[in-house]
Amino acid sequence: MPNIVDRFGQLVDDAISKPKLARQLLLLGYRAKDVQLLLAPEKELTPARQYAAQIAMDAMIAPLAHPQRAALVNIFMPCELLHAFHLLPMFAEATACYLNGAAAERGFIHYAESAGISPTLCSYHKALLGMGLSGTAGKPLFTACTSIACDANNLTFRRLAQHYGIPHFYLDVPYDHDEYAVAEVSDRLREFAAFLEDATHQKLDEAALQQAVAHSGRTLELLQQAQAAKAGRNLHNDVTSEFYEVFVTHTMLGTPQAEQYARKLLADIEASPMGGGTRLLWAHAVPFYQAPVRERLNFSAENQLITCDMNADTLGCYMNPDKPFESMAARLVNNIFNGSAQHRIQRALELCRMQQIDGVVYFCQWGCKQTMGAAQLFKSALEAEGYPVLLLDGDGCDRANTMDGQTATRLDAFLEMLHSKQEALV
């Protein structure tokens, strides 16, 4: 028998042909959840994780409620410039996951596929396309994306810009991690600033941009300390909180809320007890809604989710407020998702060593060619260093592409192997 969330999702699906109604229904559901998060937060969550749930929900509601100030962007687009212009970023992964949380993702994915979008495209992008092409997202001010890390970016954001008749900005990031690439991207970000001035009919407030970059710098420094502090600690973590943190480490960088979260997270981790459990690194998207994943990893002292590599993609990046464009460019160029898969492999090894990881789950997201293409290379490299890797197929947002039975069987076998390995060392 369908529960209240499933019924709500069906209401939204039934209203897609009336996009204003569908948007109002989503906003009603999201705002109700926002009130619950504020007045009755989940008690098992640490203070930082409770705060993350609140600010992520707020960041999802704002562009949906005010599309005239919204920008459709990809997850890696530097958003300090948007914050300086008081614009509201909306990105594919967040849109899709919140639709999933409302049990409404399938209707929008089906809408996109019915409009000619390939079924093999990343489900996150199909959900955003369905929201946009149906009119449910409202008409944003513009679209903007980078070439990192997904070839769906060009299709998704260009198609939406053409559909709405709005400007589109594309930031092509060079493959190499060097000073020439940083200089090139810095110039393109200055062009993006001019693009924003044209779109908003406002001049860039350079002091506001410097302040945003300063927030980013302090946030990244605190997050780096938090990642290091995880070593040997028994963390009270859950899979959904790792998704919320993706907001902080990407589109919310440059905001005081992101800095506040990072400060709270460091305090929570430093207050955590030492020792215990099998320690896991998760690579790529986390299917937070899947029961087999939640049941085995949420708040588990035995099987602990320590880190998702998407929340460690820019560790060690220094942000200089006096050189905002160069700082944003360096963060983008040196992102582990830019260029060779070796960058991502090396970051995973750094995290494994630093955080005393026992095993790695490498999630092959439906439609993500980069992640699936690097899977065997990743597995071979980490296992050569003594870190077992589970390659797990699935979908981080579309229930139709998930197989709970297979996920449960493979996770159980992997965790049992890690437990046996630990017992043999005792």
Go through the PLM ranges and name each one.
Residues 2-69, 186, 190, 194-312, ...:
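A charged, amphipathic alpha-helical module
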Residues 48-50, 117-124, 147, 335-341:
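Short, flexible loop segments at the rims of nucleotide/cofactor-binding pockets, characterized by
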